[in-house]
């Protein structure tokens, strides 16, 4: 799903959790995917039962309010370990993206690199990835971060931006499925 639909996810998750309160409380919640995970952690009420996750990232962001312009939204980075430390019973498989190690490899292969261009799409996963990379790049003063952001661009403007990148630039591809116009690009 595209990021502009994110405010709807919160209400859907709230409805599911409310449906299974009291006598209907499950013994385990299974969450698959970034969007479902974001919907769950964005809830004020989270039942005190174990959660099993799949296809989610260790890095996350909370969902925006419904009246927010997602193209301009600058969310705060959240490490899922913080939730575990606060007592959330969490298990499963988390993707962990090591931005520092990617930068180290880039510097080893291309020591003259001056710019990192990050491509992200108009999805929750794309914005969560962008938030993580921006956080990690705050500590890397000698490289410039260039954002090729699918929340603000379609595939054609991204291609033009790639053509016009400065010399000594390496591209990191975060994710690309959905552009600003909700155009899907899968398997091409």
Regions found by a protein language model. Give the residues of each.
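Short hydrophobic alpha-helices and adjacent helix-cap/hinge residues
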Residues: 1-188
């Amino acid at each position: 799903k595209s990021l502009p639909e994110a405010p709807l996810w919160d209400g859907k998750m709230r409805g599911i959790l409310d449906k299974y309160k009291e006598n209907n409380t499950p013994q385990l919640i299974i969450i698959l995917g970034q969007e479902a995970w974001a919907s769950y952690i964005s809830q004020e009420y989270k039942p005190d039962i174990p959660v099993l996750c799949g296809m989610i990232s260790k890095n996350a962001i909370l969902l925006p309010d419904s009246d927010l312009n997602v193209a301009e939204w600058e969310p705060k980075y959240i490490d899922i370990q913080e939730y575990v430390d606060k007592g959330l019973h969490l298990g499963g498989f988390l993707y962990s993206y090591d931005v520092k190690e990617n930068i180290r490899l880039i510097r080893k292969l291309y020591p003259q690199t001056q710019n990192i261009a990050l491509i992200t799409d108009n999805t929750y996963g794309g914005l969560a990835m962008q938030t993580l990379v921006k956080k990690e790049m705050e500590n890397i003063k000698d490289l410039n971060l260039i954002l090729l952001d699918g929340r603000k661009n379609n595939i054609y403007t991204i291609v033009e931006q790639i053509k016009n990148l400065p010399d000594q630039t390496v591209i990191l591809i975060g994710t690309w499925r959905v552009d600003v116009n909700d155009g899907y690009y899968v398997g091409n």
